[in-house]
Amino acid sequence: MFPIKYIDNNLVWNKDNEVFAYYELIPYNYSFLSAEQKFIVHDSFRQLIAQSREGKIHALQIATESSIRSMQEQSKKLVTGKLKEVACQKIDEQTEALVSMIGDNQVDYRFFLGFKLMVTEEQLNLKNIKKSVWLTFTEFLHEVNHTLMNDFVSMPNDEINRYMKMEKLLENKISRRFKVRRLEIHDFGYLMEHLYGRDGIAYEDYEYQLPKKKLNKETLIKYYDLIRPTRCVIEESQRYLRLEHEDKESYVSYFTVNAIVGELDFPSSEIFYFQQQQFTFPVDTSMNVEIVENRKALTTVRNKKKELKDLDNHAYQAGSETSSNVVDALDSVDELETDLDQTKESMYKLSYVIRVSAPDLDELKRRCDEVKDFYDDLNVKLVRPAGDMLGLHSEFLPASKRYINDYVQYVKSDFLAGLGFGATQQLGETTGIYMGYSVDTGRNVYLQPSLASQGVKGTVTNALASAFVGSLGGGKSFCNNLLVYYAVLFGGQALLLDPKSERGNWKEMLPEIAHEINIVNLTSDKDNAGLLDPFVIMKNVKDAESLAIDILTFLTGISSRDGEKFPVLRKAVRSVTQSDSRGLLHVIDELRREDTPISRNIADHIDSFTDYDFAHLLFSDGTVENAISLDNQLNIIQVADLVLPDKDTTFEEYTTIELLSVSMLIVISTFALDFIHSDRSIFKIVDLDEAWAFLNVAQGETLSNKLVRAGRAMQAGVYFVTQSAYDVSKESLKNNIGLKFAFRSTDINEIKQTLEFFGIDKDDENNQKRLRDLENGQCLLQDLYGRVGVVQIHPVFEELLHAFDTRPPVQRNEVE
């Protein structure tokens, strides 16, 4: 029953001397693709299958395991900076928590493709005939030795080299359409051990040795080494196998396809993709495909057509009506014959086998029922042939033959391409900051926010900026806080603008990094007067001048297009910039010194703001020193008593206090430019909460683009936290945003805007429903590779949940 005779690199010889070349198909992301994109993938896979005019193809979807500990250890290697010790301790605690929740390993589906290598016809001459006779004779001798001694298997070196050349050509053809990796001996070892009931070993940690002895004309391997991964006691029952190892036992059952009722319409027939999301337990699938070349296929179809016509004639002669089955079959055969004749395409004999395993019989029965129901819903009828379990088991082994002909399905390449082989949902990186898990696949999602600027292969953006959008209470602030916290732990530096003063308790709530948290609370005390004056807060005089103009035009409503007022204001600001004592109060003095009706008017207008509420923070007389230090790893700037306008309020409707509040945000955000221009070797984050407040005004929009562009050059990411995707959807900004997070929204226009922002089909009802039905803490995530999926944000630690939760506390009455 064991088909493998010899393995060399990714080549497998079977007992019938057929040679297969095996590859791992690197999975491609399939979630949230438009119908058009799905058809492009479908077409590529159809061409991949159709390029082989003869031979066999063996496709395997195997549920392997990946080690959580290994991923977390790799993540620790990314940690740098002052908080390295705290970060490593946090990651270790996180690892233990994750392992206790989901075990040491998580299921990871891998896709393997084996192609039979077809021998090219050699020129018929005496030399080749002698060579062929000699090969046959030596093979006979080896077979006798092997039968008598049963100790080694040999393979002529000429034979190996011949097939290796053919494999190179094949690999070149395949890799034009899909990313593939040649299998190694470890892969084959894992595959065999997995099929024989061994689990609990992470794929990347598994090792298998197959020592070879290379002689002058042949290479030898020990037969024992070849079959070592299959060690176990197998007990065959009618409908299942019992696999027993020293320390455990498992039960395995095999299904095969009995019939496909009706059509499997694409896109919606991607069985390989959907079953990854459907089942909470591992399921393996094998497709053994034999290619029937066009002429043979046409002959078979025409013979079938004759049989059906005979049945039709027989019914006519007997005076009875032809059954509807025969009429339908005749129509189908006519259509198929025409299709094959025109396209010259091959047909495919498909043996489709599903492997279900479980630790005990009851669980096996439950899992088998679930698999059967899933396929039933797709109009695919499965059977478990009694007494054929061991034979179907052998179909999963590399280079195996089709075991049974009773359940063969004749299909075209369209059908095989529509099954979604290799399709999966991938999100984020393999290591980095653990943010949560994919809602569809349950796989952990890791992010590396600083990676975008490194130009990693496959990324579709080099923008470090991120956007967090969604309606109130969906979890965007929580997710944003969590990402910033871990980015700081991993060695980054952050400046958070906290307009609602929600982060004031972080020092108490996060004691392990309290010494690196700097909270600057700008209250309306007289001591803080002038602290936010552009000339005080900005190091660069040119930046200070430009910010002063922005703030004063914003407050007074003077447009740069106003030919009377703007030049007067501009001249006054320039005079102050060139003087020794710089401050916004001096601009008023300069305007009064001008002493024209226009300058007096502007001076009075600006002066009317100076003593209004907390406006004195913006105005200094040039004697104030900058007291805001950003040397800590985590810096939070709060301005007390800010009153932000409602989201729907237009700029013309802003009240005076709202105008002042937004101007404060603009000043602090511009101050972030100095922070961005600090040490380029450190990844920095400028976090702008309630970003919509200044993104909706012209000065704020210009500033945001300036921040993002400066950030890209200086390894700094600007994080926009806002309620609507519209705020960050303007082309100039949208194209400079990398990571995108979208939380629940119920407004249909907002949903469409968000989907468009993510670059996915906004009119697709399924996409709209996904966004509408998101639960609290779930978000749509687009990673640096342009892949989109739904993530459940998972803080792991309760103290982080309490620290970052911005919801108002619930009053509870204590029951005595």
Pin down the residues of each PLM region.
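Short glycine-/polar-rich loops that comprise or flank the Walker A/P-loop
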Residues: R53-K56, Y109, F490-G492, I517, ...
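Extended, folded cores of ATP/NTP-driven motor/assembly subunits in large transport
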Residues: M1-Y410, G420-F421
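P-loop NTPase motor core of the ASCE superfamily
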Residues: S100-M101, N540-H586, S729-E816
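Conserved P-loop NTPase motor cores
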Residues: D312-H314, R443, S450-V484, L497-G504, ...
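Charge-patterned, long linear interaction tracts outside catalytic cores
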Residues: N125, V439-V445, S450-A452, K457-G470, ...
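Post-Walker A helix-loop "phosphate-sensing" segment adjacent to the P-loop in P-loop NTPases
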Residues: Y485-L495, E508-M509
